[in-house]
Amino acid sequence: MYQPSLEEVKSLAGQGNLVPVYRSINADLETPVSAYLKVARGPYSFLLESVSGGERLGRYSFIGTDPYHVVKTGPGQPGGQVDPLTLVQDEMDKYRLIPVDGLPRFHGGAVGYLAYDTISYFEPRVPFMPADPQGVPESVFTFVDTLVIFDHIRHDIKVVSHVHLDGDIDKAYAEATRKIDDLVKRLGQPLDLPPELQGPATVSTPVEATSNFTKDEYNKIVEKCIEYIYAGDVIQVVNSQRFSRKTEAHPFQVYRSLRSINPSPYMYYLDLDGFQIVGAAIETVVQVQDGIAATHPIAGTRPRGKTPAEDDALEAELKNSEKQRAEHIMLVDLGRNDIGRVSVTG
């Protein structure tokens, strides 16, 4: 039922101090959304979902809850105003993972976010920003060693926990399998939706979104950025503004609506003790695996044509667009420079 077995785990003990154990169950009656609603507990949980839609289908979706450790940084936060990645690295350095067959490369670890404000830790020339008026931390990372993994190719669910090998292995294995069985039990129960999540996933309200800038203030920022570009001080600027909109919709209903209208390979819902982050992306910003760093930026889109001839025409339009070509060159240049700062050739 559990893989690897207790005897197999004991035989691996000399290779590290942490080994995953998992149990597979059928996924034909479950979706990542329903599974998340069944298993999420407490103030922290997440759903990282690859949604089937359009022409793309990511292989895995991940659900985590009940983290064993949480890092929060920023002004007034428990972790203080420090480089959050050093705290993440300190926690990860405690473990020497022993890989096992049958699992994706991610089956536990740190899940969270870095706010734009954290740029000051990585680029010392950038001054520190004032504390966020919304009270949102600069970073939050939850550390999970037990989670649910959907395999959309094999149509199964793997419920994973981890055995700590530093102490009594029998007790650690029993605790890991107990956590697995608890999640399997939750998944097997009927879905009991609270009232705020019943009905269609709609978030429409009569209130318009408001920005933290007036139009004139924002236009002045744009003009200043253009001056910097002409002066050769910058090659790329992202002008940001915060839009706010009141709604009575539950945050997970917002996620469900986004999931419906914009299904993407990388969708995420993070519940972080008092606030939530909802989003979707079609590209891998950065990935590191086996010591290889990669980035896959995407720029330039056109709608699909109704015929192959229309598709060909739209493709040619993209390839011949001076603006799109310039953006691609810029993205390749930026990606090469950023990866080059933390990598070696060969």
Protein language model regions, located:
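Extended alpha-helical targeting/anchoring segments
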Residues: M1-G346
